[in-house]
């Protein structure tokens, strides 16, 4: 079962938190889900080169907070915050309500499964050999200190007439172990021969503590006590 199901969905409430955090009325549920999908698609298209690894959407009665986790936050913010204001206006026009945008930096982009999948897809579109693209991403992830990584590509690889699936695995990726922290990413490469699907699983270690850990908040720096002369 662990081999087939989405590893993030399987671990929700165990060691993964939801990416859409809100509680609507039952009648408004389809509308909110569709709106979240629109926001994610818009941001992915608008900020493709910023290297977005995750988008978290939180809602209150009248406000909407969007947290964007990106490898290159400077592209989103722009000079003196000009680009982020334009983005905010576009999002408000899209959803029709007040939007707050929070930007977080992805500190280890090589260890993000979504960014790794997009990296392989980009290389395939540039006609790089699929084996070379996969090995390059695996080496980068291992340097970032991950415990294991699996990369899978499926489609008309190398322009072959018949589609097939190829994958590489380095280290451990225990998909059945629920306490294992598994990151998962998917991307599509649009080539002249057709669409090639890219899937990446990254094992980051085991979470032995039960429940979802709260996100770490930045603590104010304490000043060192002055010495009396």
From Swiss-Prot:
GO terms for molecular function: mRNA binding; rRNA binding; structural constituent of ribosome. The gene is rpsC. Keywords: Ribonucleoprotein, Ribosomal protein, RNA-binding, rRNA-binding. Residues 39-107 form the KH type-2 domain. One of its GO terms (cellular component) is cytosolic small ribosomal subunit. The keyword Transmembrane does not apply. Part of the 30S ribosomal subunit. Forms a tight complex with proteins S10 and S14. Belongs to the universal ribosomal protein uS3 family. NCBIfam families: rpsC_bact (TIGR01009). The keyword rRNA-binding applies. It comes from the Bacteria. GO terms for biological process: translation. This is Small ribosomal subunit protein uS3. Binds the lower part of the 30S subunit head. Binds mRNA in the 70S ribosome, positioning it for translation. HAMAP family: Ribosomal_uS3_B. PANTHER family: 30S/40S RIBOSOMAL PROTEIN S3, SMALL RIBOSOMAL SUBUNIT PROTEIN US3C. Pfam families: KH_2, Ribosomal_S3_C.
């Amino acid at each position: 079962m662990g081999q087939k199901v989405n590893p993030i969905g399987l671990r929700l409430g165990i060691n993964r938190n939801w990416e859409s955090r809100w509680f609507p009325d039952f009648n408004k549920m389809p509308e909110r889900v569709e709106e979240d999908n629109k926001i994610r698609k818009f941001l992915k298209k608008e900020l493709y080169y910023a290297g977005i690894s995750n988008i978290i959407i939180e809602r209150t009665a009248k406000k909407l907070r969007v947290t964007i986790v990106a490898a290159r936050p400077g592209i989103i913010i722009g000079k003196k915050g000009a680009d982020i204001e334009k983005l905010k206006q576009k999002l408000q026009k899209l959803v029709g309500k007040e939007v707050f945008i929070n930007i977080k930096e992805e500190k280890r982009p090589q260890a993000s499964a979504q960014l790794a999948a997009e990296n392989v897809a980009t290389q395939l579109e540039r006609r790089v050999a699929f084996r070379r693209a996969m090995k390059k991403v695996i080496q980068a992830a291992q340097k970032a200190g991950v415990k294991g990584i699996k990369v899978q590509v499926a489609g008309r690889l190398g322009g072959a007439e018949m589609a097939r699936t190829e994958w590489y695995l380095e280290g451990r990726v225990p998909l059945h172990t629920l306490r294992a922290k598994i990151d998962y990413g998917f991307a599509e490469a649009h080539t002249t021969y057709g669409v090639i699907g890219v899937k990446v699983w990254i094992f980051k270690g085991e979470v032995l503590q039960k429940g979802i850990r709260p996100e770490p908040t930045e603590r104010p720096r304490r000043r060192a006590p002055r010495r009396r002369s």
